[in-house]
């Protein structure tokens, strides 16, 4: 059969429509997917020009975060020994221009100039230098921003090239050079400072003037006749007058570790160290032996109540008021010339500008052949050699102190002017002022200062000696004057009208010593060992004790002994 079998139209039509519908949906779905892909590709292609730069910057930032020339170093626990060549800020001079140096210092200040430049002041003790961090080469923008955000007083390691400056950098000690930084790392990061170093470093004359101006305005405000507008104007002037933070002495001492970072204060203690060094050098050169006496003793070393009492196991002990008795025991042991640098304790409730309950004593004792003035000559020679040494070896430190605390240069001559107590009292009496008539056989503080001014006017010096004091105002071991038992072979040394040393010929006869001790109220049993040491023969001897902090205070004209004490102790302060 050649004919085809007919297919029912209805059945064939229904099947064809369903298949077409499914195929249509499939095609539409595929089309949407294709369009979405095309759109995404088109957007990606259209944005390729701008997004390329953004991606590059992002990648660059990621690289910079891992940069090897800036950041914060891990804590140094001495894991390994590394040999590197370091340069002190003080060594940065024009002789190093063009050379690469490695510096460790404190970040004193930082100043961002836009996004790509930062100026930093680095401080190392007394010395400061400017460092510049600029974008370029291996220095990234992130590095510049990082340096600009390093907290003040952080300790940093800086690798840099020394370059000369066309204009002196007046804000730094190293004025003729600066550093072009190539690496910058934090060694020890500082937290928020309770006091700013800038405030602690402020020149005293600026603070004094501000205080004077404020007092004057305050006095004007006390006028009850002022109208409201006048009061408002004065209050405004008072507010405008306050330009500087005036940090009190108490706040400085409460934050002593920060206060001592100030260059002027660093210099004070370098000078203090210098006084000890010069004291030791001079006496060693004259044949003295350095000794170290005990500070916990069984009895008060001086008469009086100014002694710290301690519980010592099952008995009582005292803190030594001086090494006096032990210096003399050394003389009895034929040491002949001895000195000591050590702590001295005085339980005196004296809240003055020149008293401390603990200070450093510079003591000496020596035998003499004919007259106690041999010892006085030694003291004169010693002190003037110290003054001379400070001038020649510590000029930079003196200049640094003078910048913050201006003072007149210390004047002295050798031999120094000497006066008896009566001669000095007569100079004061010439003023015809009842306040300067010497009573009680000794000078008071006001009389001492006035005497210093008189001698400065007449002799042009700040250092002088007064000899032959009344025996009743000297310790029990002081030798009386054989020509007049009311006087003593005793002397004081003065700087700028304040006593810095008391000394005398000592009693070396045990019977006279015991008699004198009894007359001064000393319990003989407590010092029997001391008295007995003179029973086996003892050379005549003399000496003195100098207060270290007082010497530094007066030489630099500081006005308060607490500035010359590392961590001062007075009746109200036991910390830090």
Swiss-Prot record:
EC numbers: 6.1.1.12
Binding site for ATP: 346-348, 354-356, 499, 547-550
Binding site for L-aspartate: 302, 346, 502, 506
PROSITE patterns: AA_TRNA_LIGASE_II (PS50862)
Pfam families named among the record's database cross-references: tRNA-synt_2
UniProt biased composition (Basic and acidic residues): 20-43
Reaction(s) this enzyme catalyzes, per UniProt: tRNA(Asp) + L-aspartate + ATP = L-aspartyl-tRNA(Asp) + AMP + diphosphate
UniProt KW keywords: Aminoacyl-tRNA synthetase, ATP-binding, Cytoplasm, Ligase, Nucleotide-binding, Protein biosynthesis
InterPro entries: Aa-tRNA-synt_II, aa-tRNA-synth_II, aa-tRNA-synth_II/BPL/LPL, Asp-tRNA_synthase_2, Asp/Asn-tRNA-synth_IIb, NA-bd_OB-fold
Compartment(s) of residence: Cytoplasm
Region (Disordered): 1-78
GO cellular component: aminoacyl-tRNA synthetase multienzyme complex; cytoplasm; cytosol; phagocytic vesicle
Matches recorded under SUPFAM superfamilies: Class II aaRS and biotin synthetases (SSF55681), Nucleic acid-binding proteins (SSF50249)
Keyword RNA-binding included in the entry's annotation: no
BP-aspect Gene Ontology terms: aspartyl-tRNA aminoacylation; response to bacterium
Main location: cytoplasm
Region (Aspartate): 324-327
HAMAP family from the UniProt entry: Asp_tRNA_synth_type2 (MF_02075)
Name this protein carries in UniProt: Aspartate--tRNA ligase, cytoplasmic 1
Organism of origin: Dictyostelium discoideum (Social amoeba)
Gene symbol of the encoding locus: aspS1
């Amino acid at each position: 059969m050649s004919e085809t079998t007919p297919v029912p139209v209805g059945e064939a039509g229904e099947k064809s429509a369903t298949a077409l519908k499914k195929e249509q949906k499939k095609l539409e779905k595929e089309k949407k997917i294709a369009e979405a892909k095309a759109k995404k590709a088109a957007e990606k292609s259209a944005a390729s020009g701008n997004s390329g730069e953004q991606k590059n910057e992002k990648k660059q930032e990621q690289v910079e975060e891992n940069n090897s020339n800036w950041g914060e170093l891990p804590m140094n626990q001495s894991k390994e020994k590394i040999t590197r060549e370091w340069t002190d800020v003080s060594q940065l001079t024009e002789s190093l221009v063009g050379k690469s140096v490695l510096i460790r210092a404190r970040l004193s200040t930082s100043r961002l100039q836009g996004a790509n430049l930062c100026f930093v002041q680095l401080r190392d003790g007394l010395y400061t230098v400017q460092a510049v961090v600029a974008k370029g080469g291996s220095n990234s923008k992130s590095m510049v921003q990082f340096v600009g955000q390093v907290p003040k007083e952080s300790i940093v390691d800086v690798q840099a090239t020394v370059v000369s400056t066309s204009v002196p950098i007046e804000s730094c000690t190293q004025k003729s050079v600066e550093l072009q930084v190539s690496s910058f790392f934090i060694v020890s990061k500082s937290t928020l400072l309770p006091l700013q170093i800038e405030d602690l470093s402020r020149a005293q004359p600026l603070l004094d003037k501000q205080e004077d101006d404020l007092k004057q305005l305050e006095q004007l405000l006390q006028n009850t006749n002022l109208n409201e507008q006048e009061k408002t104007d004065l209050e405004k002037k008072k507010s405008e007058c306050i330009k500087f933070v005036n940090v009190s002495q108490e706040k400085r001492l409460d934050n002593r570790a920060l206060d001592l970072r100030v260059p002027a204060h660093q210099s004070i203690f370098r000078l203090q160290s210098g006084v000890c060094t010069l004291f030791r050098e001079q006496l060693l050169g004259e044949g003295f032996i350095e000794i170290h006496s005990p500070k916990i003793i069984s009895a008060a070393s001086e008469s009086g109540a100014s002694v710290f009492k301690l519980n010592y196991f099952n008995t009582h002990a005292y803190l030594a008021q001086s090494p006096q008795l032990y210096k003399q025991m050394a003389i009895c042991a034929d040491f002949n010339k001895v000195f000591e640098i050590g702590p001295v304790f005085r339980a005196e409730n004296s809240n003055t500008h020149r008293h401390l309950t603990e200070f450093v004593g510079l003591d000496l004792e020596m035998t003499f052949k004919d007259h106690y003035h041999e010892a006085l000559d030694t003291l004169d020679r010693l002190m003037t050699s110290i003054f001379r040494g400070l001038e020649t070896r510590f000029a930079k430190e003196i200049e640094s102190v003078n910048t913050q605390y201006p003072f007149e240069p210390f004047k002295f001559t050798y031999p120094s002017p000497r006066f008896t107590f009566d001669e000095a009292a007569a100079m004061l009496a010439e003023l015809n002022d009842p306040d300067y008539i010497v009573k009680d056989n000794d000078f008071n503080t006001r009389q001492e200062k006035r005497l210093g001014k008189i001698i400065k006017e007449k002799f042009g010096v700040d250092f002088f000696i007064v000899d032959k004091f009344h025996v009743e105002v000297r310790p029990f071991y002081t030798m009386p004057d054989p020509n007049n038992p009311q006087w003593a072979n005793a002397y004081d040394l003065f700087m700028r009208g304040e006593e810095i040393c008391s000394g005398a010929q000592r009693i070396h006869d045990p019977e006279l010593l015991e008699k004198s001790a009894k007359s001064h109220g000393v319990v003989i049993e407590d010092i029997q060992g001391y008295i007995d040491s003179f029973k086996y023969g003892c050379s005549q001897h003399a000496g003195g004790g100098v207060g270290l902090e007082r010497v530094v205070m007066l030489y630099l004209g500081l006005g308060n002994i607490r500035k010359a004490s590392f961590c001062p102790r007075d009746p109200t302060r036991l910390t830090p």
